[in-house]
């Protein structure tokens, strides 16, 4: 994943550490210069455009709220990351978060790249998802 956050540029890769639990991953981050970021950004390929917001839902505990743009502009997903398995196992999702899609390979980030609402509608109907339009 190629990311820009203000004047910080990164190339991120997630590695699955478990074949049975998609939430157990290692993230490798390569810090880029602005020039390196621009080089990767101009490459052809499937892309996702989104704005990420950090929300402190408990003291010291943050959720990352992804508001998608372009063809997926109706989609909002929330990501929770944990320091260890005990924290993950003791987590209770906030009531405003409706479904846990962690183990759903049809909604994994790589799968969403290059897709539109119409493309993934059949995959998300099982969640009775209501599109969220922000103005």
Residue locations for each model-derived region?
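Phosphate-end processing signature that detects enzymes handling 5′-triphosphorylated RNA
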Residues: 1-135
């Amino acid at each position: 994943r190629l990311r820009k956050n203000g004047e910080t540029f990164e190339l991120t890769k997630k590695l699955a550490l478990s074949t049975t639990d998609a939430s157990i991953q290692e993230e490798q981050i390569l810090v880029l210069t602005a020039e390196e970021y621009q080089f990767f950004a101009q490459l052809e390929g499937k892309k996702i455009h989104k704005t990420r917001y950090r929300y402190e839902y408990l003291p010291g505990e943050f959720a990352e709220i992804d508001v998608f743009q372009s063809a997926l502009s109706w989609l909002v997903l929330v990501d929770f990351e944990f320091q260890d398995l005990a924290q993950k196992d003791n987590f209770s999702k906030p009531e405003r978060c409706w479904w846990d899609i962690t183990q759903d390979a049809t909604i994994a980030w790589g799968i969403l790249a290059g897709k539109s609402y119409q493309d993934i509608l059949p995959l998300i109907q099982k969640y009775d998802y209501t599109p969220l339009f922000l103005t």
